[in-house]
């Protein structure tokens, strides 16, 4: 297989796998930040519309986690046990499941776009129109995102994080070129605005997926993805194994997003600037959680392979090393958000009211960054052991508490109370 994570120095092995994954996660953050920076030139109403549409692409990632997490953990554990044939079977089942769910989500999104966007009760007509346009395109072609996430997980399970990184790098460059061209329409190009942003993002996702798929075909190296058949019947053993690990993760991801949607709906009562702030603020914050999540993905594969091989000492040492790394990163992000909120906000907003709102948001969320990084790392470790149900129960229980707390604090403190 591409990479054996059960041998060699623990920290070096883990870091070698983690750095490309964290870099890929950072590129994912840049995807979104690039969009927001260009869309910000269209005004806060356009940003608010994309923010609403982005909630549904985020929700889809929770569903996609079923195939990604289930496939990644099962494949990595099989590799650790030396069961290459079963690893291939789980990989094929994961890709098939991702393709099916991606197409199903796209179809439902196209049929119910009006109802989905209507949930947020956007009072501004321009923001509502932007949300409709973005959602139809970004969710209507969401299958590329489903496939990309799952292929990334399966590459990572084999100890190969460089291929997804290179694919994402090319996708980012594509997105950065297409964004200003399609959004602003310089020269002979038409100004597509929010629609252009959605087209640029989907095109980049399609390119990333294609590169990872072609790498399997072109390279001569052994890969569990070689020879998969999308239309073959999925054996119950493989489907059940993926769902057993993947469903709790998917439920956790979708529940978290659904709760965020409820909070966004509460925030929308304070105007388009507030919604835009929450959307952009979330993208800025993703510098923290995407990096931690990327390290958690590396730790997940590391632990799954070593757990499958019965090397629990490496499992424990790998977790401790990861915890220190992401904890320090979280502290640095906290300092940046709390000490320099205005310079950060001014990158994305150009209206005084929106900048002031964003400054308050960044300071509030800044205090939780280190804790969040530790949480994501621990979830990655437990998931590598196959304990996804425990992670799901704990996460959903405490995340759900955000709604009553937002109602109480929002009533006492206004908009800032919801964010606290």
Language-model-derived ranges and their functions:
Residues 16-35, 137, 171, 204-208, ...:
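Transmembrane helical elements of multi-pass membrane transporters/channels
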Residues 5-37, 41-42, 58-70, 74, ...:
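N-terminal transmembrane alpha-helices
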Residues 26, 30-48, 117-125, 181-192, ...:
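Helix-terminus/linker motif at the lipid-water interface of multi-pass membrane proteins
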Residues 140-144, 148, 152-156, 164-210:
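Helix-loop-helix hairpin linking two adjacent transmembrane segments in secondary transporters
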Residues 59-62, 175-180, 209-213, 287-290, ...:
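Hydrophobic transmembrane alpha-helices of multi-pass small-molecule transporters
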Residues 47-107, 145-164, 264, 277-340, ...:
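Small-residue-rich hydrophobic transmembrane alpha-helices
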Residues 1-18, 75-141, 189-247, 303-368, ...:
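Short alpha-helical transmembrane segments in multi-pass integral membrane proteins
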Residues 54-57, 101, 170-175, 200-208, ...:
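Transmembrane alpha-helical core residues of multi-pass small-molecule transporters
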């Amino acid at each position: 297989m591409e990479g054996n994570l059960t041998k060699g120095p623990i920290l070096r092995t883990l870091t070698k796998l983690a750095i490309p994954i964290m870099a890929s996660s950072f590129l994912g953050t840049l995807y979104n930040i690039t969009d927001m920076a260009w869309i910000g030139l269209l005004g806060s109403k356009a940003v608010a519309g994309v923010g609403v549409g982005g909630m549904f692409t985020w929700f889809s990632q929770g569903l996609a986690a079923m195939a990604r997490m289930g496939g990644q953990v099962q494949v990595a554990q099989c590799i650790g046990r030396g069961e290459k044939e079963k690893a291939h079977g789980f990989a094929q089942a994961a890709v098939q499941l991702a393709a099916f769910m991606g197409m199903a989500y796209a179809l439902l999104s196209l049929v119910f776009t009006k109802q989905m966007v209507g949930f947020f009760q956007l009072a501004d007509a321009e923001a509502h129109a932007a949300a409709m346009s973005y959602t139809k395109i970004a969710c209507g072609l969401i299958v590329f995102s489903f496939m990309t996430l799952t292929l990334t997980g399966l590459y990572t399970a084999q100890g190969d994080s460089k291929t997804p990184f290179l694919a994402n790098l090319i996708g980012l460059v594509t997105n950065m070129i297409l964004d200003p061209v399609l959004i602003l329409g310089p020269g002979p190009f038409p100004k597509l605005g929010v629609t252009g942003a959605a087209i640029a993002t989907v095109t980049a996702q399609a390119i990333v997926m294609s590169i990872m798929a072609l790498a399997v075909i072109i390279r001569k190296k052994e890969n569990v993805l070689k020879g998969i058949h999308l239309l073959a019947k999925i054996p119950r053993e493989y489907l059940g194994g993926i769902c057993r690990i993947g469903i709790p993760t998917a439920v956790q991801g979708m529940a978290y997003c659904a709760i965020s949607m409820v909070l966004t709906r509460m925030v929308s009562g304070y105007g388009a600037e507030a919604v835009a702030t929450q959307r952009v603020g979330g993208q800025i914050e993703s510098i923290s959680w995407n990096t931690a999540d990327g390290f958690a993905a590396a730790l997940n594969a590391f632990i799954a392979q070593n757990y499958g091989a019965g090397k629990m000492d490496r499992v424990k040492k790998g977790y401790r090393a990861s915890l220190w790394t992401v904890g320090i990163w979280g502290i640095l992000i906290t300092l940046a958000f709390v000490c320099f909120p205005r310079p950060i906000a001014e990158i994305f907003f150009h209206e005084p009211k929106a900048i002031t709102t964003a400054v308050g948001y960044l300071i509030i969320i800044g205090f939780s960054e280190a804790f969040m990084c530790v949480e994501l790392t621990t979830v990655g470790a437990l998931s590598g052991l196959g304990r996804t149900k425990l992670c799901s129960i704990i996460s959903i229980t405490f995340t759900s508490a955000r709604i009553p707390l937002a109602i109480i604090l929002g009533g006492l403190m206004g908009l800032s109370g919801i964010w606290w």
